[in-house]
A protein has these predicted regions:
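Intracellular juxtamembrane helix-capping segments at the cytosolic ends
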Residues: 205-217, 407-420
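Helix-loop-helix hairpin linking two adjacent transmembrane segments in secondary transporters
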Residues: 228-272
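C-terminal transmembrane helical hairpin of 12-TM major facilitator-type secondary transporters
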Residues: 368-408
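Juxtamembrane intracellular "pre-TM" segments in multi-pass secondary transporters
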Residues: 89-96, 276-307
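Helix-breaking motifs and short loop linkers at transmembrane-helix boundaries and internal kinks
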Residues: 132, 164, 185-190, 387-388
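Conserved MFS/SLC helix-loop-helix module at the cytosolic interface between two early adjacent transmembrane helices
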Residues: 151-187
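Cytoplasmic helix-loop-helix junction between adjacent transmembrane helices
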Residues: 197-231
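Helix-to-loop junctions at the C-terminal end of transmembrane segments
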Residues: 153-164, 353-365, 450
Length: 485
């Protein structure tokens, strides 16, 4: 019987009928929109409840007929319910599935935020000429940024297991806006160093996103979803070099950092509107949280191996990128920053490899992917050294080193989350801190070798680091993991 044909004896019966009908409409729209359970403690539910109570009182004191009031309540309640359900943020459940709109938001924001680490690479030569400093001092900008990133990974990312991740992310976006503006307005190299350190520390946001993709994806989709987020991250790295090279040539290197600050504001708004609150998984104090990192390192040898061999390979990767601007600025290229940035497009092959590696890492095996990755990086360095005075040799080297690096990074990073799923942020902290410490070491060694031996020295240190990563893989056998207490 529809409500227009129904008769009520008192207001209490009307109120009961309203609540039953309202819950039914909620359930219908939940089923249609695939939205999680309606939370009765939600403020909007309470608002609806007060609305019903108001109309109940309205009827009881005789100010209106039950039938007309009932029609009004249905109209208002339906509008309220639909408005709420369409705007409600999805509640995430572990292994319950990650909605596509959240997954792609994570991937896009990861790419835009990680780009802050790499804007400087095509601009180093331009910055050096404007500030009148040495190549070594200029190269320290890239190294300090990577060190800052490692610090952020070590001390901030673990907080995702202790506090709500959304608050951590928004705080870091706020600090990023100020640090990027400081770099753009810096009068000397020393302020750039300090602001670059803060930029590096706060740019660890993507490494909070990666555990989210792993933790809340269905088991069969974990590798694919982690690969999508990392693909977004890699695309951001590649695009950062292209964009900064172009902007540096057309507008100037300072303007690039002002634009980046504006992009961080947009990312903060996106996270605020789309990402749901995620409850922490660790109970205790920050000191206990940090101590648990050492327990994880001690108890899981595979975690140490995965992290170290990937970090050493990343050092080889960044050795190339940190000195490429200096190489391309000399004979026979004499290239400007926009040309150096365009070379970043060659790494699109590496970004496209990420989701593929994530999908097949279980079938092919971590060990095999590491052999493939190291082999490709060694071929890259051969091309960069023996054919380094031709665009063909440089492009081939960039392609090979990007694809090889993704084979190593993604196979190892995807596998670490299987070691201890309940400590996903801390496991990722250990991996990525080691990873970027290796990157910082490679950047520093490459800068020193460039000063002494030029491009041959850079190729030499890159090859040595790759061989060391390969040796670790050869000597290590994959192990099964016991659960972390």
């Amino acid at each position: 019987m529809c409500f227009s044909q129904r008769r009520f004896s008192n207001g209490s019966e009307i109120q009961s009928y309203l609540f039953a009908e309202f819950k039914q409409r909620i359930a219908t729209m939940q089923l249609f929109l695939k939205i999680p359970d309606f939370n009765k403690r939600n403020k909007k539910f309470q608002l609806a409840k007060h609305l019903f109570s108001f109309h109940y009182l309205y009827i009881k004191i005789g100010c209106g007929s039950a039938q007309s009031s009932l029609k009004t309540v249905f109209s208002l309640a339906s509008t309220l319910a639909f408005h709420y359900l369409c705007r409600m943020k999805t509640e995430l459940k572990e292994n319950g599935g990650l909605p596509a709109h959240i997954l792609w938001t994570l991937a896009i924001v990861a790419g835009v935020s990680v780009a802050n680490l790499y804007y400087n690479q095509p601009l180093l030569n331009v910055i050096r000429h404007e500030l009148g400093v040495s190549e070594f001092k200029t190269n320290l900008i890239a190294m300090i940024t990577q060190v800052g990133y490692a610090i952020g990974l070590l001390f901030i990312v673990p907080l995702g297991d202790l506090y709500q991740r959304k608050k951590i992310i928004l705080t870091n976006f706020t600090l990023l806006i100020f640090s990027l503006i400081a770099i753009g307005a810096a009068p000397d190299i020393y302020i750039i160093w300090g602001a670059s350190l803060i930029t590096g520390i706060c740019s660890m946001i993507p490494q909070i996103f990666v555990p989210i993709a792993s933790q809340f994806s269905r088991p069969e989709n974990k590798g694919r979803n982690v690969g999508i987020v990392i693909s977004g991250l890699l695309t951001g790295i590649l695009a950062s070099r292209v964009v900064s090279g172009f902007v540096g040539e057309v507008l100037g290197w300072r303007e690039m950092y002002f634009i980046a600050a504006g992009m961080m504001l947009l990312c903060a708004i996106a996270v605020l509107k789309i990402l749901p609150d995620i409850q922490p998984t660790f109970r205790g104090k920050y000191g206990d949280l940090m101590k648990s990192l050492f327990s994880l390192i001690k108890d899981y040898p595979s975690l140490r191996i995965y992290s170290i061999r990937a970090g050493i390979a990343f050092g080889s990767f960044l050795a190339m990128w940190s000195c490429l601007a200096f190489k391309m600025g000399q004979a026979p290229f004499y290239a400007d920053s926009d040309v150096i940035g365009i070379l970043g497009l060659c790494g699109i092959a590496g970004a496209s490899t990420a989701s593929l590696v994530g999908k097949y890492v279980k079938k092919v095996g971590i060990r095999n992917f590491n052999f493939i990755g190291c082999g490709l990086i060694l071929l890259a360095w051969a091309s960069l050294y023996f054919c380094g005075n031709t665009y063909a040799g440089i492009i081939a080297g960039v392609l090979l080193i990007d694809i090889g690096m993704q084979c190593i990074q993604l196979s190892n990073q995807t596998s670490i989350f299987d070691i201890c799923p309940s400590a996903s942020n801390r496991v990722n902290t250990i991996f990525m801190t080691t990873y970027f410490t290796g990157g910082s070491l490679g950047t520093f060694l490459a800068g020193s070798c460039w000063q002494t031996w030029g491009w041959a020295g850079v190729a030499g240190i890159g090859t040595v680091l790759t061989l060391l990563s390969l040796l670790i893989t050869i000597c290590h056998k994959e192990q099964q993991h016991a659960p972390f207490p």
